[in-house]
């Protein structure tokens, strides 16, 4: 392992011990904000510290085994060779783990997120599939112990959604779901298809980090156009008699957010503003990322949500992720919320790309 990496790890361990000491300080315990911030830092440092301590122990074990390999006793030498092999394997594995733990963290990864699903090409079937995707993500959120809440929805006439936005609340929700952004294509025989022909339709998914109040961008009232209207259900029928639904247009960027799920206009406006802020910040981050990663592929997809990332093929029972050439034949399980087998390989590929970029930059 490089000396520069070892120095960085030693610094992190020192900070871990310092934070551990501070958490026992009565002044810190009495200051809720400070205690919360230090507790979070402590939990972030704990994993890398424990891993580095295991690495150091493996190095000590290797040195001891190499000494033992020089013994006169043949049985001791054989035992030493076995211990040397085990220690070297542990060092290699822990080195890889430490490199991943030291990769730059996306500051948004720990945050809640907004999940936006829009029906694309494919008519009624696209709307039905948008509903299927929302159910899939809801099931996945349930397995993770996250809470999912519909912020805004526009139901399709034959089931599902024309478009919908949900808030996913839970530890690391954005970091896990951010790779879901992009085009999702479905190939199946629609329930209305009498000839048994397979149809292709598509939906787009966008995942945006929820922005904490302290980090919200300044949005001037003069830059907003706010319209109120009556909430409507599937087929356009009005579902209440007051103008409680809200449409907010951010004039400088042309970003539009609608919210009509609450009966209160005030609540709909608050929800719409939260989504608007997330969209504005996301667009700016995507613009910056595009500037620095023209040459390197970006598994997070581009601002163009039509980038096809995944195909769900019902006749073959398969799901394919086009970004990493992965195909699994577990469609039913995936649609029931078993997404980890699709998410983990993309995260691993992203980490491999980050490691390659670090190696290129020395």
UniProtKB/Swiss-Prot annotation:
So which domain of life are we looking at?
Bacteria
Instruction: List residues, modification N5-methylglutamine.
Output: 237
Q: Return the GO cellular component terms, semicolon-separated.
A: cytoplasm
Q: Which Pfam family is an annotated match for this chain, by its short name?
A: RF-1
Localization per Swiss-Prot or TrEMBL = Cytoplasm
Report the coiled-coil segments.
none
Q: One GO molecular-function annotation for this sequence?
A: translation release factor activity, codon specific
Q: Which InterPro entries match?
A: PCRF, Pep_chain_release_fac_I, Pep_chain_release_fac_I_sf, Prokaryotic/Mito_RF, RF-1
What SUPFAM superfamilies does the entry give? Release factor
Q: Which family does it belong to?
A: Belongs to the prokaryotic/mitochondrial release factor family.
Q: Which PANTHER family match?
A: LD18447P
Q: What does this protein do?
A: Peptide chain release factor 1 directs the termination of translation in response to the peptide chain termination codons UAG and UAA.
Concerning NCBIfam families, the annotation shows:
prfA (TIGR00019), PRK00591.1 (NF001859)
The identity of this protein, by name, is Peptide chain release factor 1
Annotated organism of origin: Vibrio campbellii (strain ATCC BAA-1116)
Quote the gene name from the UniProt entry.
prfA
């Amino acid at each position: 392992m490089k000396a520069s990496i070892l120095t960085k790890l030693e610094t992190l361990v020192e900070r871990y011990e310092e934070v551990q000491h501070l958490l026992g300080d009565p002044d810190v315990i009495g200051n809720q904000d400070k205690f919360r911030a230090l507790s979070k830092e402590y939990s972030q440092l704990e994993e890398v510290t424990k891993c580095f301590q295991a690495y150091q122990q493996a190095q000590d074990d290797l040195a001891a085994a190499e000494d033992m390999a020089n013994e006169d006793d043949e049985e001791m030498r054989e035992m030493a060779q076995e211990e040397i092999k085990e220690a070297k394997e542990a060092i290699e594995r822990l080195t890889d783990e430490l490199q991943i733990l030291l990769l730059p963290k996306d500051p948004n990864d720990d945050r809640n997120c907004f999940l936006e699903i829009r029906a694309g090409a494919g008519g009624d079937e696209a709307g039905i599939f948008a509903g299927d995707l929302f159910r899939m993500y809801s099931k996945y959120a349930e397995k993770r112990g996250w809470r999912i809440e519909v912020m805004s929805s526009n139901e399709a006439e034959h089931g599902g959604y024309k478009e919908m936005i949900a808030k996913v609340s839970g530890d690391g929700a954005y970091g896990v779901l951010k790779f879901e952004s992009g085009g999702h294509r479905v190939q199946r025989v629609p329930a209305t298809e009498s000839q048994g022909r397979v149809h292709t339709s598509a939906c787009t998914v966008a995942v945006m980090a929820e922005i904490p109040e302290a980090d919200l961008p300044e949005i001037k009232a003069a830059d907003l156009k706010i319209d109120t209207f009556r909430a409507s259900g599937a087929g356009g029928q009005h579902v209440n008699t007051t103008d409680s639904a809200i449409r907010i247009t951010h004039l400088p960027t042309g970003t539009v957010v609608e919210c009509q799920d609450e009966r209160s206009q005030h609540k709909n406006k608050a929800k719409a503003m939260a989504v608007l802020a997330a969209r504005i910040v996301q667009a700016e981050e995507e613009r910056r990322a595009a500037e620095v990663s023209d040459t390197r592929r970006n598994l997070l997809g581009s601002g163009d949500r039509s980038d096809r990332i995944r195909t769900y093929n019902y006749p073959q029972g398969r799901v394919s992720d086009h970004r990493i050439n992965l195909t699994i034949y577990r469609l039913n399980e995936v649609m029931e919320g078993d997404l980890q087998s699709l998410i983990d390989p993309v995260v691993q590929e992203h980490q491999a790309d980050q490691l390659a970029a670090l190696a290129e930059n020395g």
